[in-house]
From Swiss-Prot:
Record bears the keyword Phosphoprotein: yes
Family, as annotated: Belongs to the IL-6 superfamily.
Signal peptide positions on this chain: 1-29
PROSITE patterns attached to this UniProt entry: INTERLEUKIN_6
GO biological process terms held by the UniProt record: acute-phase response; glucose homeostasis; hepatocyte proliferation; interleukin-6-mediated signaling pathway; liver regeneration; positive regulation of multicellular organismal process; positive regulation of receptor signaling pathway via JAK-STAT; positive regulation of receptor signaling pathway via STAT
Subunit structure: Component of a hexamer of two molecules each of IL6, IL6R and IL6ST; first binds to IL6R to associate with the signaling subunit IL6ST. Interacts with IL6R (via the N-terminal ectodomain); this interaction may be affected by IL6R-binding with SORL1, hence decreasing IL6 cis signaling. Interacts with SORL1 (via the N-terminal ectodomain); this interaction leads to IL6 internalization and lysosomal degradation. May form a trimeric complex with the soluble SORL1 ectodomain and soluble IL6R receptor; this interaction might stabilize circulating IL6, hence promoting IL6 trans signaling.
GO CC term, one of those recorded: interleukin-6 receptor complex
Pfam families named among the record's database cross-references: IL6
Record keywords, A-Z: Acute phase, Cytokine, Disulfide bond, Growth factor, Phosphoprotein, Secreted, Signal
Superkingdom field: Eukaryota
Protein's name according to its UniProt entry: Interleukin-6
Gene Ontology MF terms: cytokine activity; growth factor activity; interleukin-6 receptor binding
Function: Cytokine with a wide variety of biological functions in immunity, tissue regeneration, and metabolism. Binds to IL6R, then the complex associates to the signaling subunit IL6ST/gp130 to trigger the intracellular IL6-signaling pathway. The interaction with the membrane-bound IL6R and IL6ST stimulates 'classic signaling', whereas the binding of IL6 and soluble IL6R to IL6ST stimulates 'trans-signaling'. Alternatively, 'cluster signaling' occurs when membrane-bound IL6:IL6R complexes on transmitter cells activate IL6ST receptors on neighboring receiver cells. IL6 is a potent inducer of the acute phase response. Rapid production of IL6 contributes to host defense during infection and tissue injury, but excessive IL6 synthesis is involved in disease pathology. In the innate immune response, is synthesized by myeloid cells, such as macrophages and dendritic cells, upon recognition of pathogens through toll-like receptors (TLRs) at the site of infection or tissue injury. In the adaptive immune response, is required for the differentiation of B cells into immunoglobulin-secreting cells.
Length: 211
């Protein structure tokens, strides 16, 4: 199969298939929470930009479905006043200094930023996995696919040992804080997380296309 087209598969089925692809594509996988201890890259497979692009498109499709579902179920739509304020969330964003924009584009800097940003999103995806009340297949697919995308992009970073992982203590503290909020606020946070991840991936998609 040369495409990540999912028209014939459910989100869960695709996620399981993605795990099989990951198992064959990465014979010696490195856990996301561990830094690379060996700087050599000759034995790591190179992944074409097309695969990363298709995977990003797939994730964006799942996010779109989740946002639509929340809009219909909770009236948490894109133009809702609550979703215009990011409250106390410190969600990853893309800026000019990250080297991902066409002006001032820097492939290595951009790859590092996308990879680290997606790692930072993991704690928020855990939150979605715990509290999203819609189609759980979509939340699972987004989380698994995002981890797969991180692995794909790490193959292209020249110095993967410099890809820092978020502090687990900080992440745990943030997750505990989010969990103490009422359901209305949780729903607002979830739509903010989805919107921010979507924006981040849209910038990432444009950057991957010119790499």
């Amino acid at each position: 199969m040369n495409s990540l087209s999912t028209s014939a598969f459910s989100p869960v089925a695709f996620s399981l298939g993605l795990l099989l692809v990951m198992a064959t594509a990465f014979p010696t996988p490195v856990p996301l929470g561990e830094d690379f201890k060996d700087g050599t890259t000759s034995n790591r497979p190179f992944t074409s930009p097309d695969k990363s692009e298709e995977l990003i498109k797939y994730i964006l499709g799942r996010i779109s479905a989740m946002r639509k579902e929340m809009c219909e179920k909770y009236d948490k739509c894109e133009n809702s006043k609550e979703a215009l304020s990011e409250n106390n969330l410190n969600l990853p964003k893309m800026t000019e200094k990250d080297g991902c924009f066409q002006s001032g584009f820097n492939q290595e800097t951009c790859l590092m930023r996308i990879t680290i940003g997606l790692l930072e999103f993991q704690i928020y995806l855990d939150y979605l996995q715990n509290y999203y009340e819609g189609d759980k297949g979509n939340t699972e697919a987004v989380q698994i696919s995002t981890k797969a995308l991180i692995q794909l992009l790490r193959q292209k970073v020249k110095q993967p040992e410099e890809v820092s992982t978020p502090n687990p203590i900080t992440g745990s503290s943030l997750l505990n804080k989010l969990q103490t909020e009422n359901q209305w606020m949780k729903n607002t946070k979830m739509i903010l997380i989805l919107r921010s991840l979507e924006d981040f991936l849209q910038f990432s998609l444009r950057a991957v296309r010119i790499m």
